[in-house]
Every structure is written in structure tokens, then in C-alpha cells.
């Protein structure tokens, strides 16, 4: 059932000011997309600020750009933030420290659970984390005679790593939203991206194990051609995010690790979108060990896939505050900290809000929730439900979507992806979704869902049903 949205004069006035003066993400000021005012939120629902005498709620299937993993107005996170707010909101991390920062890093390292990753830099946002990671890799290589001339980054096409300059330089150079800046960015090295899979062979839903060794041919070629220039490899493990929402086979990541080992190249993993359970493992790179375990490879013969530099963000604070972190191994930390390094051992980066006490308090509690382990059952249930209700429906040709308007459908952990043949009309789609009580924000040819882990079975059923309904309406719309 659709609902009409209307506003009180006061709210309409605010929306008018917003339209004239506020720049929204990836939007034109001269012809901005419609926006919907939110007055409160709880669980998985946003409450719109309308003139209705009863609350108009929409289920947020996007987790506010993938970060609100524990849901809105979470009592535990609220309490942690409130307690800290009454003590102090922020203190310079240069020359000072505080219990919140120390406790957060202790628990973050427990969540990561990799003995080699022991050194943490707290940053502001996902893009800043990537900038820090690139800078760390460069400075680490400056400290070695054999590596000091390695200044290029190797990545794969269809990647997305953020909107700042260094991050843009490792985004897809042809099809990304940043391609217009190409001739103004540092020039890096791009290999062909791996093929998309419908789902992972590590999934409980029994996706077929399609691996083709040819997938790494171009990557190997780039290593052979440029090994003396490659400072580090950077990529999004297992699921490429805003560059196309492309899940790929764990074996590809294993092969990348082999090449990094062979050529002694640092490996940066950008888990800003995929980290903290989103793909079904606490971090996406851990699918590699699971895949090798499934194939009966003994631990002594397995390829240990683990980054030298790990970027995390989004779910770190579950959307309460902006925060990210970069975690590195001893190899990177000791090179940067060497008295013989160009800076005398200092890493020359220091955000104003580094280790913000409010952000640390809520991030620490977010880590507590993850350490309890409930996320695994939640994400597993979400994946199963998306598979049954959305994936299987769309894959059935009798339902008239696959091969007509839908090019492919994938499910990986708490992510459902529908790629269309035609580019979406965001205004048309958002109006349809909101009127039916669901928030899904499409981009390019993609409609996808990444709900909070706390979404109920009933809420997710509604999300899946509304998405299917709107896809059928889109089919009729474009065929008019």
C-alpha cells in the first residue's frame, strides 16, 4: 500500500531552505533530488517529519550508507555516548590519551583477531583512512633501500576507495564518478577486476564454486611489468562496493596475496564497507581461510591471507559518529618508526578529531556488541532470507525480471544486489520506495539492500517484497 507524503508549513519552509542552500552528496545544486525530512529513528525504521497525525515510518534497507549495523537509537550505544558526554567530548590526542581510546583499540584488535595486526591509527572517515594507508605504505617504503623508489599503487578496476585525492587516484579510472579528475591525480596501475559471482562458495546457500585461473592473468602481468614501482596493492576484499557492488571469488584474493608475498609488496585491504560482519565473516578477507578449510587444505599448506594495512570504518561506531581506523603489522610500523626513516621515526599525520572521546565511547560499545557474536547469526539469517525471497524469485525466469530488466542478482552476507540493464532514475525509484514504506537508494544500474543486522524477519520480507514490486513497476515504466 502506498502512502502520500505531505508536510506542515514549518517543515515545508525548512525543505525549501535546504533545497536552496544545502549541498547533498553526489547531487546538483541547480536540480537537486527530492529529500525527505527525518524527525526520529529506532531499530531499522526512520520516522519522517510529516503532517500526518500518526508516525510515517520507512524501513531503512541501506543502514544509512552501510554503517548503522546495530540499528538506530540502540540503548547500549546511547548509554555509552551519554556517559562520555557528561565527562568530556574531546581532547587532543597529541600529548594526551584517554581510557576510551585505549579501550577501543584493545577491543578492535580483539575483533580483528589477527596476531600480526597490532598497531592502530584512529582517523576521521573512510576516505581519510585510505589516505592514511596510502601515506603509510609510501613512508614505509621510503625506509628501505630496495623499496624507496616504489611510488605507485596497484589496484583493480571497478574499485572505490573514497572521494579525497589519494583515494580517488585508486578508484576505477574509467567508470567511476571521479574519472573527470584523472589527468589531475597521481597515476597508478590498474589490473582487470575479477568476474562477478552470484554468491560466495563459502555461503551456506550452496553457490557453485566457479573459479577460473585466468582471472589473475592481467594482475600477474602488471606485477611482472611494474614490480620495481609498486609500493602496495590496495583493493576491497571479496566485495567491491560503490564501484559496482561486485562480489568475487575468494581464490582471487588468495592469488593476490601470493603475488604480494612473491614480490615483497605491501597489501592494503579496504574493509570500510565490508568489515564488521557485513559479508558473513567478521572481515571479508577471512573468507579465504574458510574457503581453504572447506577444500581440506591443511593449515600448514594454506596461504595466509591477511593485510599489512587494514582500513576500517562505517560500522565501527554503527553510524553514531564519524570515525575510522587504520591497523598495521610490525613490518609497516617498524619501518615508519625507524630512527633512520626520513622523518626520524614519526608518522606525519594527525587529524584534529583523532581519537575523539565521544566517537571512541560508542565505537568501544559497538565492538562489545560484535564480540558477543550475535552478528553471525543475524547476518546468516539475513543472507538466507534475501536468498529465498529475493534471489530465487528474480532468478526464476517465469517471474519476468531476469533477462528483461534485471541483468544479475547477487547475495553475499547481509547484502542483496540487483543490477539492471538500464541506468536507474533515482527520483522515480526513491519516490516509489518511500511511498511503500521502504528506503532503498539506487545508483547507476544498481538497486541493493544492506540492512542493519537487527532487522526483523517481517521487516526484511517487506523490503524484499517492495523491491520486487518496484522492479515490476520499473519494467512497465520503461516499456511505455
From Swiss-Prot:
Pyridoxal 5'-phosphate binds at residues 126-127, 270, 351-352. InterPro entries: Aminotrans_3, BioA, PyrdxlP-dep_Trfase, PyrdxlP-dep_Trfase_major, PyrdxlP-dep_Trfase_small. GO terms for biological process: biotin biosynthetic process. Substrate binds at residues 160, 350, 441. Pathway: Cofactor biosynthesis; biotin biosynthesis; 7,8-diaminononanoate from 8-amino-7-oxononanoate (SAM route): step 1/1. The keyword Repeat does not apply. Keywords: Aminotransferase, Biotin biosynthesis, Pyridoxal phosphate, S-adenosyl-L-methionine, Transferase. Its EC number is 2.6.1.62. GO terms for molecular function: adenosylmethionine-8-amino-7-oxononanoate transaminase activity; dethiobiotin synthase activity; pyridoxal phosphate binding. Catalyzes the transfer of the alpha-amino group from S-adenosyl-L-methionine (SAM) to 7-keto-8-aminopelargonic acid (KAPA) to form 7,8-diaminopelargonic acid (DAPA). It is the only aminotransferase known to utilize SAM as an amino donor. Belongs to the class-III pyridoxal-phosphate-dependent aminotransferase family. BioA subfamily. This is Adenosylmethionine-8-amino-7-oxononanoate aminotransferase. The lineage of its organism: Eukaryota, Fungi, Dikarya, Ascomycota, Saccharomycotina.
